Structure formats: structure tokens, C-alpha cells
Amino acid sequence: SRKNFKIAEEQNDWFKSDFVDLRKGDAMDLPVEDNSIDVAAQNCLFNIFKSGDLKKAIEEMHRVLKPHGRLVMSDPTCEQEMNDELRNDERLRALCLSGSLSIADYVKALTDAGFGTIEIRARKPYRILDPKNYPTDELIYIESIEVAAIKDPMPADGPCIFTGKAAIYYGDEDYFDDGAGHTLLKNQPLAICDKTAGALQALGRDDIYFSESTFHYDGGGCC
């Protein structure tokens, strides 16, 4: 609130409350102009909204970002099916757990809104829902991921999704050029998006190694 900014101003000589433009708004109707924001951030948005509201909220963030702007996020995800009782548990909703999506569904929600590049920057253990404390017959394992969704144009062949894959060329030449914009220097890992990994693997070469997804992409990749 504005009151908190005033307190910060009193305690820090360098800070001025007018450094911050504080606006009252709604995630599904942001009081912000189109194409005006460089970076937007959210935490646990995916886990408190129902699917229709979530779709609208993501579309709103895509609307306000400038071209190539970034939506930076951290959310719980779950690769297991949750029963309806867990999904509708208000306690779990308050804990930002009941709406946990699989990573594939999470990414799809972002690309459906028009984000052309997705970077999964971290994936970590987060919580367990166990039968003793929750209405479930099995252990439910929940992870936390950190993602940047970038407002790049959507490529004709689909979004560029970086999950931490890399390709390493170890052939006889100094480098390998696939003729599609990807040059692999000999014995040097090149971070690649999942789409490019699939295209290179389809070449059937026996002198390129492909790593599995680390889900810790840190930039410098090629799509």
C-alpha cells in the first residue's frame, strides 16, 4: 500500500515513494496500456484461478507487455492427477497447491496466449500431499518451477520451449551446420529448444549427443 511506501521513505533517505506507480486493479482487467511493460511478474497465479479466469489473466499480461517483454513466474506444478476433492479444497487453494498443472499444461496455457518463447529456468521439489493429512489414496508429489514467458512472435512451426536440452557435436569436422541456422562447434555444448532438438535428432546422425531436459535453462540458447 501507499502507507508502506511512506514508511520505507522515512527509513531510507535514498527512497522516494513516487518511485513506484501503485495502481488498483484486477488480474483479469489490468489498468495498464497495451504494449507498455518490459517485465511482468507473478507468483502462484496458476494455482488460485479456475481455468477460464487463468486464461484471461495470462492474456492480460500478454497484452500489456511490450514486444519481447517477459512474464517471469514461479508456480507449483504436479505431474500426477489430483482428485476433485483436492482440486476444490479451499485450504489447498490458499496454499497455492490445488491448481497445480503438469508442466506440459502449464506451458500450453502460456503459448495459447501467444507467448512465442518459453524458458524453464528451475525445477525443484516443493511439497507432498499424503493420505494421512489429505483426501488422497496416494502420495502426491508437487514441484516448483521458475519460468520466463517471452512475448516473441509465434514461429510458424510452433513455440520455442527451452527445457535445458543441449546438443554436442563430436564429428570429424570443426563444426556442424544444419543449414537451418544452427551451428554446433566441435565438442562444445549448444543450448537448444525442444523443437530444435527434435529436428536435429531427426537427421539421424551418429556424431551429435543430445542431453535430456535439465529444466535449468540459463540462456544463450538457439531455436
State each model region's role.
Residues 28-40:
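A short acidic, Gly/Pro-enriched loop at the edge of an enzyme's catalytic core
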Residues 55-70:
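A short glycine-rich, Lys/Arg-flanked "PGG" loop and its adjoining helix->strand segment in the class I
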Residues 44, 60-62, 110:
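Class I S-adenosylmethionine-dependent transferase superfamily signal
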Residues 98-120:
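Short alpha-helix
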